[in-house]
């Protein structure tokens, strides 16, 4: 059974993940840690320590997943938001704004969101996507969303902080069980393949 480490950026994700772990018999989670997004170097150190102790796969999100991928040789399964999770936030933002078809910007790191290409067809909103590979450019992505006429944004901590400074409506990226479940299912399949070697 492959040894897995899971590093998540929020306590809520840790709480959601714990009861799901027993559902995946192909993987043995040896480390489950919460590391704040601003402390990505700590996430990298934890990942390197886990590797030294025999960890064979890491589950992570956002900038932490990117750092671990670039600075270790371990396979990384990324936790990505699903269309359903983003759709729920779009409807909530639409209700908050009280507009028939608001223009909403999704501001996130490019590896944090799965395929949402058809959400504009499914929801009465105009969704604009602002993805970046660098956490330091999230604030300027919010500035661009405002310049493009977005009436609200959905984003992480840095993006929402900038939206608040600009007086722009905002919602935080959701932390729900669906994206965690998807990542664990992928990790479980990878672990199964590792076990067959």
Where are these regions (language model features)?
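Non-catalytic structural scaffold of enzyme domains
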Residues: 1-197
